[in-house]
């Protein structure tokens, strides 16, 4: 089913000499950070991104921008990536709207839901970003000769898209 996403990232300000901003080390904020948000959205939809647009604030090319995404199944997403927010506001907030239902994830610590049978909220004691689970699944697949838990074409799709978005921002 089609989904609508609003993904707010309160990224925080980085100095110009920060390693993330170095194209040779961190790749810049799109290559080094946005790729993860794209990957999550592709995972949640199960679909490839077929179109995007990007807009940035004139004076902060790589620190404050909005990316809109269209997915093959008609789902849409908006990634709001800002470094000009207050540091006490959560870094990541993802809102998902689908079939009269709503989910909201705050900083990978809390999930609230409306319209879901037998679910309304879940709170974690520490951030649950899936790193441990991903490593476990990868090692399990290698050990047992299974396919990769993430399809190669999905990894390539997100990587190529990250480069395309980065190039579009710099035009």
Predicted regions span which residues?
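Interdomain hinge/lid region at the active-site interface
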Residues: 112-123, 130-137
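Short, well-ordered secondary-structure micro-motifs
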Residues: 16-18, 89-92, 116
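Short coil/turn segments
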Residues: 8-10, 108, 126-131
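Short, solvent-exposed polar/charged micro-motifs at secondary-structure junctions
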Residues: 14-18, 60-66, 160-161
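A short glycine-threonine-serine/GTX helix/turn-capping micro-motif
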Residues: 25-32, 120-129
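C-terminal helix-rich "cap/oligomerization" subdomain common to oxidoreductases
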Residues: 72, 137-171
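Predominantly a Rossmann-like dinucleotide-binding segment in NAD(P)-dependent oxidoreductases
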Residues: 1-55
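Contiguous beta-strand/loop segments that form the cofactor/metal-binding neighborhood of enzyme cores
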Residues: 32, 38-110, 132-146
């Amino acid at each position: 089913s089609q989904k609508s996403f609003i993904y707010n990232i309160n990224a925080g300000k980085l100095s110009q000499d920060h390693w993330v901003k170095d194209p040779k080390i961190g790749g810049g904020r799109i290559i080094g950070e946005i790729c993860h948000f794209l990957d999550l959205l592709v995972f949640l939809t199960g679909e490839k991104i077929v179109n995007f647009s990007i807009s940035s604030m004139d004076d902060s090319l790589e620190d404050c921008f909005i990316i809109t995404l269209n997915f093959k199944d008609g789902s849409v997403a908006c990634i709001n990536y800002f470094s000009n927010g207050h540091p006490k506001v959560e870094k990541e907030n993802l809102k998902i709207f689908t079939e009269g239902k709503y989910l909201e994830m705050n900083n990978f610590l809390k999930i609230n839901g409306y319209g879901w049978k037998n679910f309304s909220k879940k709170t974690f004691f520490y951030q649950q970003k899936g790193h441990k689970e991903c490593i476990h699944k990868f090692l399990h697949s290698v050990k047992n000769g299974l396919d990769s838990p993430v399809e190669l074409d999905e990894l390539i799709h997100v990587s190529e898209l990250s480069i395309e978005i980065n190039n579009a921002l710099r035009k």
